[in-house]
């Protein structure tokens, strides 16, 4: 999976970026596809993989989360529950006759209490998932050809108390490093933040 996806937690939000590359073998279709899908107002998933399975998987997850929210009378589904559902879907597909979903994902979310009596753990969360059904909550993570370079940068430069400006600057450095190091086109990155007020597009990262 050539496209690079990057995510990390900051002081009170999560930042996620994904390369806009959409290609069929050696043919580039577009450089500006948004691969960060909004599952709801406080959760996004950055998904890399083949076009058909990727689109099918994220739509399947999004629709099931909407159904579960309706069954819960409008109560927001937690990020951990969403990650568990995604992991179960990936692991189940791996063992089915239909075959696996060849996708790698970063799930970012910010859990907010539904009421004063709500005991759900609030705050920013980032989960790493791969096509084999691996699931782990991480402070930062990445997929794709640029992952080794970005991981090295984040090992050295990431801090849990990054401010909004520092987080955006670090994400831009990561994107620039991928563009410099990786031969496969990752010229355009789309970036989104998930703070307590809901998903926002970060225009200053590209």
UniProtKB/Swiss-Prot annotation:
Its main location: cytoplasm. One of its GO terms (cellular component) is proteasome core complex, beta-subunit complex. Pfam families: Proteasome. InterPro entries: Ntn_hydrolases_N, Proteasome_beta2, Proteasome_sua/b, Proteasome_suB-type. Keywords: Cytoplasm, Nucleus, Proteasome. It is found in: Cytoplasm; Nucleus. CDD domains: proteasome_beta_type_2 (cd03758). GO terms for biological process: proteasomal protein catabolic process; ubiquitin-dependent protein catabolic process. GO terms for molecular function: endopeptidase activity. Belongs to the peptidase T1B family. The 26S proteasome consists of a 20S proteasome core and two 19S regulatory subunits. The 20S proteasome core is composed of 28 subunits that are arranged in four stacked rings, resulting in a barrel-shaped structure. The two end rings are each formed by seven alpha subunits, and the two central rings are each formed by seven beta subunits. The catalytic chamber with the active sites is on the inside of the barrel. Non-catalytic component of the proteasome, a multicatalytic proteinase complex which is characterized by its ability to cleave peptides with Arg, Phe, Tyr, Leu, and Glu adjacent to the leaving group at neutral or slightly basic pH. The proteasome has an ATP-dependent proteolytic activity. This is Proteasome subunit beta type-2. It comes from Trypanosoma brucei brucei.
